[in-house]
């Protein structure tokens, strides 16, 4: 039988307190956004359809976002927690759209 002990904390370096530093509160509290990028493949009607189905947007709102993607090259389509934006990006990728996420500052 093998007995394993609990992991121990690493020893601190000289000149440090041994405590981990956390990110500033304002950075971790900032919302994240999902960005859809223009691509040469998907039809504008399809992009509008995807925005309606995935996000529940009305046709006018989905069309506005699609036109922003088409004319400006990108559009923010959702905002929220990092985990929620990871899910949104995955869904958009599954639908064949180019999407990324970034922290909104």
Swiss-Prot record:
Superkingdom to which the source organism belongs: Bacteria
User: What GO biological process terms are annotated to this protein in UniProt?
Assistant: protein catabolic process; proteolysis
Q: State what this protein does.
A: Involved in the modulation of the specificity of the ClpAP-mediated ATP-dependent protein degradation.
Name assigned to this protein: ATP-dependent Clp protease adapter protein ClpS
Which is a Pfam family this sequence falls into?
ClpS
- Residue spans making up a coiled coil are none
The record's gene field reads clpS
The UniProt family comment states: Belongs to the ClpS family.
Q: Where is this region: Disordered?
A: 1-27
In terms of InterPro entries, this protein maps to: ClpS, ClpS_core, Ribosomal_bL12_C/ClpS-like
Q: Lineage, please?
A: Bacteria, Bacillati, Actinomycetota, Actinomycetes, Mycobacteriales
Mind telling me which Gene3D superfamilies this protein's record contains? 3.30.1390.10
- Oligomeric state and partners? Binds to the N-terminal domain of the chaperone ClpA.
């Amino acid at each position: 039988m093998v007995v394993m002990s609990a992991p121990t904390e690493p020893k601190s370096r000289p000149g440090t307190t041994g405590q981990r530093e956390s990110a500033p509160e304002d950075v971790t509290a900032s919302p994240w956004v999902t960005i859809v990028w223009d691509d040469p493949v998907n039809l504008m009607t399809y992009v509008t359809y995807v925005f309606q189905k995935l996000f529940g947007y009305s046709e006018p709102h989905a069309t506005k976002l699609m036109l922003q993607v088409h004319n400006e090259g990108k559009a923010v389509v959702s905002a929220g927690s990092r985990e929620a934006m990871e899910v949104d990006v995955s869904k958009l990728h599954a639908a064949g759209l180019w999407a990324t996420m970034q922290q909104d500052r």
